[in-house]
Amino acid sequence: MSLDNYDKDKFVVLVCAGPSARFVKKTDEYYTAGVNVTPNLIEETDFWVVNDGCYLVDLSDEKLLKINNIALPQFPHTVNGVDYRPTVGLDYLAITKYLPSNIKIHPFNIHTAPKFNMPYNTDLPYFDVRSSSESCFKWLLHKGFTKFISLGHDPSGGYHSSQYSRPTKEGGRVMITAPIDNPRYHIVHQRMRSVIKEAGASWIRAVLPPDSSFDEEMFNKIKDHALDETGYAEVTL
């Protein structure tokens, strides 16, 4: 599915699940991206990216109507109810067939496809990733976007009060609100910074006041912030 009608020069505002996540309002000045269940913090989501199929049942019918695109592995994780391993009979077509028609579907592949001998399509984009946020960056970069602002990407871990995870070792059956793998977030952060640096892209990690939301006014305060030599900046308002 082509994204040719999107302006690749626009920023993409990515909402992650960390404590600094904030509600993002719709505006024509930027696109929005969510991972796992963070579309619940976005007025209208342009790009929803998941590695784990278990999250597809977690958004309301009303929220799904406010999502324009979903990108996910050809063989998603956490679909068999036992563990995170992808399953041949539960590919992206099987788990997305219940989504409303307004959501355009974009498959890619990740490192677990060959690891578990999945019959994956080598013509699809292929990424080595360790998180849905990293998948989001890599997929959007592959599609031509290069300017990013993130909310809720917290290297020290934790979840926003509205967010949760479904541990892959439990097959997605258990919902938790206290992360059990906080040290991993530092690794994920460094991987994502490397992705941006290698692509020659830009990433502003924003931290807003607790009761605020992200809108066009906030965007204009942040978008021109100076970047370091790797294309990265952190802004606290």
Task: Tell me the role of every PLM-derived stretch.
Residues 1-237:
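Metal-ion/cofactor- or nucleotide/acyl-coenzyme-handling active-site neighborhoods
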